[in-house]
């Protein structure tokens, strides 16, 4: 049974041609190493990792070696060690983690589901677990869903798709074409297309074939997610500016309105980086937008009644330090009345191929339409100053022209890859809805039209962190909520504040609301504006940490918002307290999502994992593990630094996240050794995979002396500041007996100790970033 299976003549020859992802910025090869494959009749097994095996079955004996919507890469760096064997009836494959048993000559998936033809056995926390195709799992930890449109409280929980991890210890990716995704679409193959210059959908070789990926990672959740991104593609690093504040509102703003908004933002000292122009930028048929009954949800031409000189306005927005995105609802195609010049250009170029009754239908399924559309319309607006696009797809979920082609996923794929190919001067990014597994490759998510109330806010922390279970790491929400059913709460200052405070600790920081004059989203109009602004400034202060964690997401596949059970999988509390999450490696967040008591105080029950946690808002050290109920005023946010952490932050005066960081802060929690880091690049470069720099921080403890080290910057520092000053804030500190920088003792007047807040502040003079700095504090 242990004889190597290759020698038994069962392995078939691979097809000579093994297609690769020719146009992806990151090299991918969807064809696995032949050494990883075991073929038995009409069944093929591919051992991808010790915990992951691909299982294919085709009545025709046809296997798929192209990429699919979900899977991009099967050529792993190393073929994992495994052994094979057989007897008269069964094939056996054994890895370090899995034992597979297959009845030769059968379809692995029986009807109804049973363990008759295929089982995989694994050890999960000391207990054997047996899986077979079709086995149900009620302990899956879920992933995400297409949209929060209509979200009221947690009514969208039931729509959340299965994730890639489970308390059961196993999960399955069913990438079979015949199995519908949540939106009714299917996972097509992808292959290079010479017309558009990137990968295009293609029918599967055998649409009825079985194509499963068994993932038996136990409770090593982070490894499961990380290995998923190895086969499904990395999560691209968004440009730095997307982590700033976005001003966004669905409203009939004129050019002068946008100018006034920018003046008010500047006058009120509000940091901001992105300006969204929602659908009133184009003719949309609304009387309120002076559209003269021209257009509708779909539009491509500027509403010159509102914005008479678009290029001039976009230049002014850029000159004020903003990036610009336009909202698109493209489903209705190109109309000869709404966009006559675009219609005529495309009709001529395509020889009227897609014309019907004065309209070119939305044929994004086809390369010739797509090439003409981007050439004639999208390039034109980008030349005017549009930086990226918001794909607000709300129409039919699957294509009326190609059966099973998901419109959400396909729009995302095409817009993103067009930007990769045709806008090489900037980092590709689009703002879009979840379209199923593989959507993480198009990185920034727009969750949609959630209702304005506290229960909906309470659902979003769970929803955001849980999306990391499918690699969807960059959800952005309508902070403040989108629409309302209760007018009494529509502009509730406390609700708006708590939503914005939650948004500080989410990937994308964007307030938004629907076109209703009763809803206010200009934070300077709220009576608690100073608290709202403080939250925005906290977001900007955290940017160096946030961007560092975004890079970690690219490197590891782990989202910056992550469930507690990633770190504490065997603690029941990590599953129970689903409104808490980790924001990166070192910050625990428990947002306030309920209204305060009559005394204005919010009381929050919080689980603290093992270790000590510094409460930034209240200035106290909390010893975990424990459950505590803490009080928070409305200007306080429950977030906690891990003891030993070293967290890089901006000065509170920063107004743009891309401003040169000539001075930074390190917040370090005294008492325990730890590490931290700072990631830097030029912010919008496409070669960030290799062109970047990092600075390591270490925190050592020896007796009553604590040593904080800023290592020399490593990597490519082209375009980055060469010299920098630092402020080291040591939290939970006693008053020191002595402080030294690089061996030189400081006078007591050269450092500051705040006894009330237990904070020691040491200012480190401007230093070359290539030089190490060491601070020793003796207590």
Task: Please give the residue ranges for each predicted region.
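A conserved hydrophobic secondary-structure block that centers on an alpha-helix together
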Residues: 153-154, 238-241, 248-287, 295, ...
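Catalytic and substrate-binding clefts that recognize carbohydrates or anionic sugar/phosphate headgroups
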Residues: 84-239, 249, 255, 262-267, ...
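Extracellular/luminal ectodomains and secreted, surface-exposed scaffolds of diverse proteins
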Residues: 81-84, 742-770
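A low-complexity, Ser/Thr/Gly/Pro-enriched, surface-exposed linker/loop concept
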Residues: 49-88
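Aromatic- and carboxylate-enriched substrate-binding clefts and catalytic-loop regions
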Residues: 114, 123, 131-133, 271-532, ...
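Short, well-ordered beta-strand segments enriched in hydrophobic/aromatic residues
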Residues: 45, 53-55, 93-100, 588-591, ...
